[in-house]
Amino acid sequence: MNEAKAKKLTLVLHNTIINMYKIERRKTRTVKIGKIKIGSGHPVAVQSMVKVRAQNVAKSVEEIRKLEIAGCDIVRIAVEDEKDARALKDIKKRINIPLVADIHFDHRLALLAAEAGVDKIRLNPGNIYRVHEVRAVIAAAKNARIPIRIGANSGSLRIRSRDAAGALVASVVDYLKIFKKARFKDIVISLKGSDITDTITAYEKMASLCGYPLHVGMTATGLPLDGIVKSSVGIGILLFRGIGDTIRISLLDEPRQEVAVAKFLLNSLGLRNFGPELICCPACGRCEVDLLKKAQRFQEWLDKLPGAQSSKLKNLRIALMGCVVNGPGEAREADLGIAFSRHKGVLFKKGRICGTVSL
């Protein structure tokens, strides 16, 4: 086989493998949440949640503005009482991303939230289930032209079952009957559990039963590291299977950290591109520099770099490697890279050495 044929065969094999593992998203309706459209025809949206009371308008706005800077697409806020509901209008005026009112127990708070101008209402079928109450919320949403998320949680199901996944799905399916009779279709669905397997099973079943967009996440995930792992595994598997139109990484941590993890997850699956990708080796006894410190400083610089989101820079893969064993090889596979030794760093560009720097 000559060189030209070998190159052609290599290209064919490469494209075949890429297509085999390319994520094909589940086909869904499009639902508009404020200025954001979600569904299979749109990017997977990143969502987070405010961790203070809505009635504390200043603190709520402060948190949301930080989330905006972090790259959050949609923000949810708990509405516990009438004072919280009345505060939503002021919050909405001072933020730039869609606001979702999280409603439990009292459907009248959803009516006030719709009146206040929120962009979506979340209802829990486990604690707002009386038909006339749900119909009232649907009517308010229709009037305000906003969608409703049917958000089932394993911890608040009305009927307990050993089959947690089945119970989550049954809860939503039963709830959907009210919406169908009201001819309301601007719906988003979530079925969150604290068990990864149950959550995945519930979402897969629901995905086969309807064409509504799915908000994907885990609930009650534990301490921050546990939450990152559980959410990344559960959500990552679903996204890889094409399931998920908005995501939230639920963490007992700063809301901005939820957004950071969500962005890394989407970036790693090739579903969103949030800027240049930094890869580093884990370091070992051969590493003669403080690679973690260098990588952190470089990432901070990269985050502040003007134009990092431009088409020329956002697709870059940059490698910082700690020694000469795997460093040169890994750095060669990146668009730009540096392999460190004690006194110098070897610079690579598109696989070729382009210089050295003294340390």
List each language-model region with its residue ranges.
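Hydrophobic or amphipathic alpha-helical targeting/insertion segments
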Residues: 108-149
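Glycine-rich, proline-tolerant flexible connector loops at the mouths of alpha/beta enzymes
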Residues: 68-90, 122-130, 187-196
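Alpha-helix-loop-beta-strand connector modules within alpha/beta enzyme cores
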Residues: 82-101, 136-148, 206-214, 301
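Active-site mouth loops of central-metabolism enzymes
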Residues: 41-59, 78, 97-105, 160-169, ...
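Catalytic alpha/beta core domains of metabolic enzymes, predominantly
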Residues: 153, 160-306
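N-terminal amphipathic alpha-helix/helix-capping segment at the start of soluble metabolic enzymes
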Residues: 17-49, 300
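Hydrophobic faces of well-ordered beta-strands that scaffold small-molecule active sites
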Residues: 44-50, 75-77, 99-103, 121-123, ...
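Glycine-rich phosphate-binding active-site loops on the catalytic face of alpha/beta enzymes
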Residues: 117-131, 218, 241-255, 340-353
